[in-house]
Swiss-Prot record:
Family that this chain belongs to: Belongs to the bacterial ribosomal protein bL20 family.
NCBIfam families in the record: rplT_bact (TIGR01032)
Gene source species: Corynebacterium urealyticum (strain ATCC 43042 / DSM 7109)
Protein name according to UniProt: Large ribosomal subunit protein bL20
Role, per record: Binds directly to 23S ribosomal RNA and is necessary for the in vitro assembly process of the 50S ribosomal subunit. It is not involved in the protein synthesizing functions of that subunit.
Pfam annotation, one family: Ribosomal_L20
GO terms assigned for molecular function: rRNA binding; structural constituent of ribosome
The keyword Protein biosynthesis appears for this protein: no
Keywords: Ribonucleoprotein, Ribosomal protein, RNA-binding, rRNA-binding
Length: 127
């Protein structure tokens, strides 16, 4: 049986790890073992943060909507409630974009939400 020599494959594997670890500080970009360990952590962080990013953007959209709603004498909570009662289906991403780029359209949505809200805050919504 022929002898298997692994140097070519091993060097290729190590070179790929070190190439992908470029830009890391210190030993993490130069030593194979440290680079490999850092690459595993990097992939874990990337996987976790791709999912966390969605929540971060939702928080940002809500902050922007709330700031714009307060300029129209409403709160975020009342705006969303009013839009639901008025049966206006606009997601938070679009609302935040309108709040930043098209203030007139956002104001129109606020007025529609105000009109749909009951006069008494504690009164149940009309069925």
């Amino acid at each position: 049986m022929a002898r298997v020599k692994r140097s070519v494959n091993a060097k290729k594997k190590r070179r790929e790890v070190l190439n992908s670890a470029k830009g890391y500080r210190g030993q993490r970009s130069r030593l194979y073992r440290k680079a490999k360990e850092q690459m595993l952590h990097s992939k874990t962080y990337a996987f976790r943060d791709r999912r966390a990013r969605k929540g971060e953007f939702r928080k940002l959209w809500i902050q922007r909507i709330n700031a714009a709603a307060r300029q129209n004498d409403m709160t975020y909570n009342r705006l969303i409630q009013g839009l639901k009662l008025a049966e206006i289906e606009v997601d938070r991403k679009v609302l935040a974009e309108l709040a930043v780029s098209d203030a007139a359209a956002f104001t129109a949505l606020c007025e529609a939400a105000k009109a749909a809200l009951p006069e008494d805050v504690n009164a149940p919504a009309a069925s």
